[in-house]
């Protein structure tokens, strides 16, 4: 595992690149700011695994104020880089170290492909937050997720690996700096190792995988298949990590 380092602004993507080039595994804990509770978050921050390299903050239905409060508190209590994983442009706060500037590539909803990004410009142009263009691809995790409901899109079938690979490559060709394969919060089925292997073989940019990973074995399987970063949320909240 890569050594934990505090990353200042403009350094987060370099960290991703270096880790991918050196085959070092990144690990992120995802905090959903909805229903933010200081006591609960304080307890969770104290038990963050030693191999954690980043904190992601975001959710599909959180408010801007919830996100701001969560980011501010986590930054005060934790030295790891805090990266926004927004479900809406209103979740953006300049207090974070970086922003995954998500484009939902797996659906046909223009709101989450480009319109949300346009709406965010007035917020972002006056900040120095590191912006990382990210191709976000929903993979069927066996249940309907909050992202599906909010975006009104359907995930790609795990059986259609060619389509998933082509979608990831389309993201890379259009200038994305990361590809994020997402099975969804609480997914029954995680992104298969076959998908991870195929996408990693095809792209030349770092690969993030999240959703449905509940055990250390599943975590290591994702790394071996080619994930540069694995994101865990629900399993950490439940004490499995």
Model-found features: residue ranges?
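Active-site mouth loops of central-metabolism enzymes
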Residues: 25-41, 85-88, 138-164, 209-214
């Amino acid at each position: 595992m890569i050594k934990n380092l505090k990353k200042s602004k403009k350094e987060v993507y370099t960290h991703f690149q270096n880790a991918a080039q050196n085959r070092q595994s990144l690990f992120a804990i995802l905090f959903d700011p909805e229903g933010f509770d200081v006591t609960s978050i304080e307890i969770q921050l104290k038990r963050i695994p030693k191999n954690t390299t980043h904190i992601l903050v975001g959710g599909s239905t959180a408010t801007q104020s919830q996100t701001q409060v969560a980011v501010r508190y986590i930054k005060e209590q934790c030295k790891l880089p805090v990266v926004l994983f927004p479900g809406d442009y209103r979740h953006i706060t300049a207090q974070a170290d970086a922003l995954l500037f998500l484009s939902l590539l797996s659906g046909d909803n223009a709101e989450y492909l480009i319109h949300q990004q346009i709406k965010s410009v007035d917020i972002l142009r006056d900040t120095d937050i590191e912006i990382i263009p990210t191709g976000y691809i929903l993979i069927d995790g066996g249940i309907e997720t909050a992202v599906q409901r909010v975006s009104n899109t359907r995930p790609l079938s795990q059986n259609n690996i060619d389509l998933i690979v082509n979608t990831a490559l389309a993201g890379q060709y259009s200038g994305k700096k990361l590809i994020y394969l997402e099975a969804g919060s609480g997914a029954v089925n995680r992104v298969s190792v076959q998908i991870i292997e195929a996408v990693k073989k095809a792209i030349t940019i770092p690969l993030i995988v999240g959703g449905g990973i509940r055990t250390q074995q599943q975590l290591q399987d994702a790394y071996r298949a080619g994930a540069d970063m694995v994101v865990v949320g629900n399993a950490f909240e439940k004490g499995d990590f």
